[in-house]
UniProtKB/Swiss-Prot annotation:
Compartment(s) of residence: Virion; Host nucleus
Motif (Bipartite nuclear localization signal): 198-216
A Gene Ontology biological process term: viral penetration into host nucleus
UniProt PTM: Late in virus-infected cells, may be cleaved from a 56-kDa protein to a 53-kDa protein by a cellular caspase. This cleavage might be a marker for the onset of apoptosis in infected cells or have a specific function in virus host interaction.
Gene Ontology CC, one term: helical viral capsid
Region: Disordered, residue numbers: 1-21
Pfam family, one: Flu_NP
Protein name, as recorded: Nucleoprotein
Residues that span the membrane, as ranges: none
Naturally occurring in which organism (per UniProt): Influenza A virus (strain A/Memphis/5/1980 H3N2)
UniProt main location, coarse: virion
């Protein structure tokens, strides 16, 4: 990439750092993890949770959500100004699950946001520690990506549900900063831009006045983030067109959808980080592990090692399969919702199934669900091998892919060819190459036509034994090509919107 000099590594985004060396980055990320861990320990004490209850992923999600809500300044301001019945803008809470007389009970807790902020800051040496908050947002986003298929959101913005491999990070809040922007997929950025343009079409004043100036600069910033994710000159030139438009409208929406479709073959670079639930960091810190001193990376072996030695439990509904629940959470932990299942099966050491074949609903339990028959079980989050996370789209390639999802977005930097259904993707590009972007469109289509099935991505990269911490002996996996590669294959996963 030509602009490599100006790109910051994610750890730098993660640490607001000016150029740091690897050791400083590892210490800095470790410090963030320490803070989350200390906060979690303190919250478990406040809530009087037993060790087992503290390792329950549902409790972890509630505690994470409470602190994210306590620091959501815009929403807090909004709630103060628009009071709604029965909602105290100064309080936050959620369901906490406890084991009472051999049964799981739900208890709704409520805390002052101020108190939660105090506990968080105290755990983070008095800082607001926004990076730790963003880290938890990305974990929630990865869990959503693995649990739900954003069919409706795609259709609403005029995209095709089969483009779901482009939707990483589609539920990340706007306030998730540079680290959040790095993990957003092409489709997510396109969707945000289309929503913005549609508002501009419907609301005369959207681009006008003092507010309009802010809106415009946000629009251009988002265009630039998206441009930075594309890896070909023609796709980037198209983004310049969209960004420079005097009055963004339907022509821009067309161009954006075109560029999103093209990303199924000419993939963009999207960062992947293994963000784990707070209930993994807490026990590690309380056992005396010093993340800052030891150093930690979100893209190397560290999360794998941590999960090898962690006990995490989950509530299981009566007709759910605990192994399937484990797969869901394992994929979320490694930000692997859109990775090739054959590679995931190889790394995990057990078969990873498409979403539609899993007998499990989401991890969260709704407030109206009956607790009487709830069991709990251990989540199996260990792996057979580990691999380095990638932020490139890999080169392009085509292969028999599935009806539901017609491309993948690689998570791991491991040699393989990347499946996508070329004929299906190309069928979307009939005809429309006129207009201002015609030469770019023609160029993009030409590159897509040229994508060859035998091309291998991440050549020479492999997975590593868990004992191989320095990544010295790459093992290049061999795949059974008859297997299905896509997770959301012909799928019936619940949609996130419900």
């Amino acid at each position: 990439m030509a602009s490599q000099g100006t790109k910051r590594s994610y750890e730098q985004m993660e640490t607001d750092g000016e150029r740091q060396n690897a050791t400083e980055i590892r210490a800095s990320v470790g410090k963030m993890i320490d803070g989350i861990g200390r906060f979690y320990i303190q919250m478990c004490t406040e809530l009087k949770l037993s060790d087992y209850e503290g390792r329950l992923i549902q409790n972890s999600l509630t505690i994470e959500r409470m602190v994210l809500s306590a620091f959501d300044e815009r929403r807090n301001r909004y709630l103060e100004e628009h009071p709604s019945a029965g909602k105290d803008p100064k309080k936050t809470g959620g369901p906490i699950y406890k084991r009472v007389d051999g049964k799981w009970m739900r208890e709704l807790v409520l805390y002052d946001k101020e108190e939660i902020r105090r506990i968080w800051r105290q755990a983070n040496n008095g800082d607001d520690a926004t990076r730790g908050l963003t880290h938890m947002m990305i974990w929630h986003s990865n869990l959503n990506d693995t649990t739900y298929q954003r069919t409706r959101a795609l259709v609403r913005t005029g995209m095709d549900p089969r483009m779901c491999s482009l939707m990483q990070g589609s539920t990340l809040p706007r306030r998730s900063g540079a680290a959040g922007a790095a993990v957003k997929g092409i489709g997510t950025m396109v969707m945000e831009l289309i929503r913005m343009i549609k508002r501009g079409i419907n609301d005369r004043n959207f681009w006008r006045g003092e507010n309009g100036r802010k809106t415009r600069s946000a629009y251009e910033r988002m265009c630039n983030i998206l441009k930075g994710k594309f890896q070909t000159a023609a796709q980037r030139a198209m983004m310049d067109q969209v960004r420079e438009s005097r009055n963004p409208g339907n022509a821009e929406i067309e161009d954006l959808i075109f560029s999103a479709r093209s990303a199924l073959i000419l993939r963009g670079s999207v960062a992947h980080k293994s963000c784990l639930p707070a209930c993994v960091y807490g026990p590690a810190v309380s056992s005396g592990y010093d993340f800052e001193k030891e150093g930690y990376s979100l893209v190397g072996i560290d999360p794998f090692k941590l999960l090898q030695n962690s006990q995490v439990y989950s509530l299981i509904r009566p007709n759910e399969n605990p192994a399937h629940k484990s797969q869901l959470v394992w994929m979320a932990c490694h930000s692997a919702a859109f990775e090739d299942l054959r590679l995931l099966s190889f790394i995990r050491g057990t078969k990873v199934c498409p979403r539609g074949k899993l007998s499990t609903r989401g991890v969260q339990i709704a407030s109206n669900e009956n607790m009487d028959n709830m069991e709990s079980s251990t989540l199996e989050l260990r792996s057979r091998y580990w691999a380095i996370r990638t932020r490139s789209g890999g080169n392009t390639n085509q292969q028999r892919a599935s009806a539901g999802q017609i491309s993948v977005q690689p998570t791991f930097s491991v040699q393989r060819n990347l499946p996508f259904e070329k004929s299906t993707v190309m069928a979307a590009f009939t005809g429309n190459t006129e207009g201002r972007t015609s030469d770019m469109r023609a160029e993009i289509i030409r590159m897509m036509e040229g994508a060859k099935p035998e091309e291998v991505s991440f050549r020479g990269r492999g997975v590593f034994e868990l004992s191989d911490e320095k990544a010295t002996n790459p093992i290049v996996p061999s795949f059974d090509m008859s297997n299905e590669g896509s997770y959301f294959f012909g799928d019936n996963a619940e949609d996130y919107d419900n």
